[in-house]
Amino acid sequence: MFLKAVTMQGFKSFANRTKIELDKTTTAIVGPNGSGKSNITDAITWVLGETSVKNLRGNKMEDVIFSGTDTKKPLGMAEVTIVFDNSDKSLNLPYNEVSVTRRMYRSLESEFLINNKKCRLKDIKELFMDTGIGKDGYSVIGQGKIESVLSSKPEDRRNIFEEAAGISKYKYKK
């Protein structure tokens, strides 16, 4: 399984629909300061269920919605879709591609979709549990994440290792 594409519209600095296509060999996103690298990682963790405004580098949740510039009006909605190659069936779905979408409106109402079918945030979290992918997974390592892990409490580090080892789903279902 690997991330094939990230499509953002109205998410933070990405006012216009922006699609980033990736392949198996992609290991990092690089670019100059201010080019949107951190917003791309925020988009990925957000669509996977991040609910902490602090982790999304904002003051309030609606900060993920494009707030406008001198030349562009603010938008009323943010939408992010990520597409995974699932030809190895790492995800327990009978599809070779799996898309996950999250939309949020200024009213703070959210919609979640798996392969364009409405679902709950819980369904997304369960789908990616023990894959190493998810808002708490370590497939996306943002600025400060490594330092955060190293300075975390032993119980928190244990949770990280349980997720990586694929046993956290058993604790979750208890």
Q: Which stretches of residues belong to each language-model region?
A:
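Gly/Lys-enriched N-terminal cap/neck module of very large, oligomeric protein machines
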Residues: F2-K174
